[in-house]
Structure formats: structure tokens, C-alpha cells
């Protein structure tokens, strides 16, 4: 029998693509069970949006982060400029919007944005650093900690988009 900790402070959850939004969703709904989130190429898009059933999609999360009560979670996100664009939305744009929402509410978060496509390549490269970042300062004698935005991140501007494949005026 394994002896696992029951407190959210001692638990993390991770996922890639739909698993990335699932990991965030689990921590968002149950921060007392999961306080650390790794989301790689998270599908914060409208895949599950079904208006006839009044079912929201993941595209609503940036707005929920901005308007719902703040959760005590620490979040690592990564995505790339070559990620998916399809009928469900734009993975790069939605991840940028999520990062800006987390920043606006002063969550303890890190956003890595590169040139990767949809898949595990970036997540594989990031995993050692993301785990070290998510677990920094962990004290097994504690069962909770108030996560706050890193002062360096707080001093940085919001993420902005530059259009590189079209003429601009």
C-alpha cells in the first residue's frame, strides 16, 4: 500500500492537449486536491462547446480566470506558434489569452511560448524545468502555501501578438 499525501499542496496534475485543459480544469474545480498544474499545448478552445446543451467549451476559461474567485494554484503552460488553427479555435491565441488572464489576476504562473507544433516535443524539452519550477520551495512539513505571482513576472508586460506572415501597416 502506498502512503500518498491528501493535501493539494503536495499534489500536481499534468496533461498535454485535451489533457492540458483537463489538468487545469481539475485544479480549477478542486484546488484542495491539486495545486500545481502543467499544461502543454492546452486545448483552451471550443471543442466541447454545445450551445443546445448549454455546455461551455474550454475557450471560456480565460474569462473565468479573470472573473471567478481566485484559486490557489501554480500553473506552468507551454505552447508554440505552429500549434493548431481549426474550426474549434486557435491554440496559440487561446494559450496566450490564458497566460494574460493568469497574469491579470496575479496567479503564480509561467508561460513558455516557442515555435513548436501541436505535440509533445516542447513538453518533453520543458518537463525537467517545469517540474523544478512547479515544485520550487516545496516543504514536506507543510500542507498548504499561498501561491503569489513572481515579482519578476509581475513587472513584465502582458503577452502580445505580432503578425509575421502578412504585411502590416
Where are each of the predicted segments found?
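Non-catalytic cap/lid and distal C-terminal segments of serine-dependent acyl enzymes
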Residues: 1-169
